[in-house]
Amino acid sequence: MNGPAGLAYLDRRERILKLGESFEKQPRCAFHTVRYDFKPASVDASCEGNLEVGKGEQVTITLPNIEGSTPPVTVFKGSKRPYLKECILIINHDTGECRLEKLSSNITVKKTRGEGSSKIQCRLEQQQQQMWNPPRTSNLVQHSPSEDKLSPTSLMDDIERELKAEASLMDQMSSCDSSSDSRSSSSSSSEDSSSDSEDDDRSSPSGPRRYSSEHPSVSAGPQYRTSDADTTCNRLYDNSALLMSTLRSDLQLSESDSDSED
């Protein structure tokens, strides 16, 4: 015992010291020490507690609290380590007998953060968590693929649309090039024919001179049915041909005026 109360039973007279049962070859009992880091005042010291030893020398101590306290119990958890050469002196206050016992292990525990509850309450909480958690996780799993990820078929459809758009654009460009080539060839042929007619008129002095004041028809060339891109190309070519014919007619009129003055 420690403190003044224990020292009161230890006087200077000699006493008989007995070795306890823990010193026998096959001890029938064992003694342990328990060290708490913090023991709240709500623990009822008059009641017995519960000590459990699990795997890996893990120890759980459950002590009841004073009636009316919340929670009803306090839980401590820790571990135990064996003693090598440690003993404890036990003094009988009634007879004054002293008995020495060998210590088996030292248990060091700490109070859990959430004040402990009974085993029944722990099981109920676990069951409630199992009932609530699975539906939430299943809903998340069901909704996440449809909202966040695209299906492979939709990706293939998008790629196919892009390829078709590129192919149609290439076709329009090729048709525009072919139409421009044909129209350039038709305009060059019309220019050659007009130049030949002018040479014939100049070579025949007695014959009457004929002047074509009409504009060459652009529609003499082959007709094409084109798209919007081809229509734009045709308009550009028509404007250039009209400008050339206007310049040619002005040149002819100026030549005729000079001949009349002579």
Curated annotation (Swiss-Prot):
Location(s), subcellular: Nucleus speckle
Spans annotated as Necessary for interaction with TCEA1 and transactivation activity: 248-262
Necessary for interaction with ELL as annotated region, ranges: 17-104
Biased composition (Polar residues): 124-144
Modified residues (Phosphoserine): 146, 151, 154
Keywords, ordered alphabetically: Activator, Apoptosis, Nucleus, Phosphoprotein, Transcription, Transcription regulation
Disordered: region residues: 124-154, 170-232
Residue segments, region Necessary for transactivation activity: 177-262
Gene Ontology terms: biological process: apoptotic process; epithelial cell proliferation involved in prostate gland development; negative regulation of cell growth; negative regulation of epithelial cell proliferation involved in prostate gland development; positive regulation of DNA-templated transcription; positive regulation of transcription by RNA polymerase II; regulation of transcription elongation by RNA polymerase II; transcription elongation by RNA polymerase II
Subunit structure: Component of the super elongation complex (SEC), at least composed of EAF1, EAF2, CDK9, MLLT3/AF9, AFF (AFF1 or AFF4), the P-TEFb complex and ELL (ELL, ELL2 or ELL3). Interacts with ELL, ELL2 and TCEA1.
Protein family: Belongs to the EAF family.
Name this protein carries in UniProt: ELL-associated factor 2
Gene: Eaf2
